[in-house]
Swiss-Prot record:
Domain HD stretches: 163-279
InterPro entries (alphabetical): 3'-5'_exoribonuclease_YhaM (IPR020873), HD/PDEase_dom (IPR003607), HD_domain (IPR006674), NA-bd_OB-fold (IPR012340), YhaM_exoribonuc/phosphodiest (IPR050798)
GO biological process, one term: rRNA 3'-end processing
One MF annotation (Gene Ontology) recorded for this entry: 3'-5'-RNA exonuclease activity
Organism: Bacillus pumilus (strain SAFR-032)
Lineage of producing organism: Bacteria, Bacillati, Bacillota, Bacilli, Bacillales
Keywords tagged on the record: Exonuclease, Hydrolase, Nuclease
Family: Belongs to the YhaM family.
Family matches, as Pfam families: HD (PF01966)
Protein name listed in UniProt: 3'-5' exoribonuclease YhaM
Entry EC number(s): 3.1.-.-
Protein function: Shows a 3'-5' exoribonuclease activity.
Domain of life the protein comes from: Bacteria
Amino acid sequence: MAKGIMTYDVGEQVDLHLLIKSSTKGIASNGKPFLTLILQDQSGDIEAKLWDAKQNDEQTYAAQTIVKVVGDIHHYRGRNQLKLRNIRPVAENEQIRIDDFLETAPIPKHDMMDTIMQYIFDMKNPNIQRVTRHLLKKYGQEFADYPAATKNHHEFVSGLAYHVVSMLHLAKSIVDLYPSLDRDLLYSGIILHDLGKVKELSGPVSTTYTVEGNLIGHISIMVTEIAKAAEELGIDSEEILILQHLVLSHHGKGEWGSPKPPMVKEAEILHYIDNLDAKMNMMDRALEHVKPGEYTERIFALENRSFYKPTFHE
């Protein structure tokens, strides 16, 4: 099996196929155009610059294009970067599939969906259970395949479902410790809090924001979806309002994207669980690529900090 791009050390030469995750045009200080390419395989992704880009390069090296690259790994501003020596699109006769380059959740998606459905079946509140089942059935296929984000955390195939499963397991332990929490409400809030991302994001490959995602966002999308589900199911109860509040407030603060701060216990706990699982995923994935005694690349979403892997973890 070919060595993954994230396993290369600084100074090593790279000669392998990669998938262009994103391609952004820029203008250098000398006035010449260049492309910033994010190149990925199943081990992760890395940035590369294509300098002095020609007029047709923007189309040739667009997102979702598989390329053969030769270059060297450099360290730049706290992160590894691929310095390109040569790059070309793959030929049709090379028979390489996009799926070969996609990072996926470590648990099969069918197993994750079975786990989530079991949490729904265990709910005792019929109104909460019906709305949750209705929405998961409506968007189940996309939910099982989509990433949880375009970057930072769980940004891989089935990352959304993996994020939710981890959060549900955390919630179960927390509710066992603090039984005054409404188990059904918290479970439902976890399952639905990011479900709007199936409309906010374009899909599991070269993920970008849709027009609806840019203009409305996953929080507002899901608040509307909960209201529509309740109307279709003939449910008119306070549970719907509180469930909408959990979705609205799960980012915690206005400056983090929530129109309202958490104002019920379960909303506060949902915010903490979401934040904890996202940060653990960021740290774990960064630490996978360093040896004991080394520091990770800087993690932008964690105040641009680097994390150290202790030597006694060898």
